[in-house]
Amino acid sequence: MFSWGLSCLSMLGAAATTLLCAGLLLGLAQQLWTLRWTLSRDRASALPLPKGSMGWPFLGETLHWLVQGSRFHSSRRERYGTVFKTHLLGRPVIRVSGAESVRTILLGEHRLVRSQWPQSMHILLGSHTLLGAVGEPHRQKRKVLARVFSRPALEHFVPRLQGALRREVRSWCAARGPVAVYQAAKALTFRMAVHILLGLQLDEARCAQLAQTFEQLVENLFSLPLDVPFSGLRKGIRARDLLYQHLDEAIAQKLHEEQAAEPGDALHLIISSAREQGQEVSVQELKVQNLPAVLQESAVELLFAAFFTTASASTSLILLLLQHPAAIAKIQQELSAQGLGRACDCPPRAPGSAPDCSCEPDLSLAALGRLRYVDCVVKEVLRLLPPVSGGYRTALRTFELDGYQIPKGWSVMYSIRDTHETAAVYRSPPEGFDPERFGVESEDARSPCGRFHYIPFGGGARSCLGQELAQAVLQLLAVELVRAARWELATPAFPAMQTLPIVHPVDGLLLFFHPRGTAGAGDGPHL
């Protein structure tokens, strides 16, 4: 018995020694990791590095970021300030928020910083995208794509978008059970992007399959840049290659068309631009120029820009309107004042039947421009729940920001969400839902930094080209919802919001929809 006790004590002592040594080694490794980045500061500058933590060797604070979501950034902002350092996705990062600092970053494109996204995102989206282009190639690509979002193009899109949104709202009202709004919004925005923006002719089954593959790609965009079995990057690469296979046939058909089925769509403009530069080259010559690969990557980039972000904002719009019935009443008043308060005359469809409606669209860009309160609601949704949390840049040279040095070569991430949350230029607290805050402009909002308090679409040379189209989609959705439907929670409480990779409700937002004027079947909050 005595020898057994000594044996146990010996084993416990050995285990304790092992744990102590492991702890000391981990602590030493962390200190050496921190020292490695401290020594990487630009010694030509007397300014210190921003405060912050570089986390654990190689992993940095990536795991904390993935687990904590938006709380990761807010907790460090409270501890270190609006400019702090961290280490995410394999790179040292300076996190920036606040209008003045964000203005420096966004207006410093090509001078202080250049666009940079996580390596995994660059690998998955490709090298021919607007997102990854720098300098003159970026300006040329932006010039081509700007034609897609010109006012004549938007005038062409609006009636088709309204028709698609009207049919979707009617289908939600005809559903026999609860609708998972986020999933439905993703399917809807993907169909609109494929058929209206890209002009591709795909049937519903193929479009749904394409959407599922694309979603898997986007879910792995922000992953560690390690191409090993079962890694997020490997899953994303498989999804991307499968997506290219699906797109190849549709793009090949597009290349053989003399004129687009829907003039003005994005792929038609890219093809036309290549032909103009090549003086009407043939399809075979376009293929030699690697145009199919360019079109594949451009199509995926446009889908990424239109798909998840618009679906996220659409879901947030529906959620916030449900939480704030007073906004619904004001939208109804504005629609009535503009003679737009009446929904289509088609009778409500029986549950399970086709949601088709033969009514002509009655909205245009000019009509949307007169709906001032609807515009304020959309802006407030994008301010309170911006779909994308921020943007990435790389420092081209060491420069000063808020009393700190930003070393050359380090990544800079400007925060949209944190900037919105801390802006003090509005007449009401920034954490509340108040569309009318956009009805009155304060003196601070007119300052040089004023427009950088509200940046859901970024700013500067990299501002979102499709922002007017996105806002039009949200305005159309608000109008069609308010005048045609009522909706209520299908769950006991409102869901929490997840912020990575795109803002969305954790349960997809389960709601019951009813045609306006009919009795609801639920007991939860409803409109």
Predicted regions and their residues:
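Cytochrome P450 proximal C-terminal region
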Residues: 1-23, 165, 213, 336-337, ...
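Cytochrome P450 catalytic-domain helical core, especially the substrate-recognition surface
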Residues: 2, 52-71, 92, 118-201, ...
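Conserved cytochrome P450 catalytic core segment spanning the I/J/K helices
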Residues: 57, 150-152, 239-313, 344-349, ...
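Cytochrome P450 fold signature focused on the C-terminal beta-domain
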Residues: 40-43, 257-269, 332-371, 384-404, ...
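Cytochrome P450 catalytic-core helices
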Residues: 309-334, 468-483
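N-terminal membrane-proximal hinge/A-helix region immediately C-terminal to the signal-anchor transmembrane segment
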Residues: 2-129, 134-136, 140, 162-170
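Conserved cytochrome P450 K-helix/beta-meander segment immediately N-terminal to the heme-binding cysteine loop
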Residues: 414-444
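Conserved cytochrome P450 K-helix E-x-x-R motif and the immediately C-terminal K′/meander segment
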Residues: 60-81, 238, 242-245, 249, ...
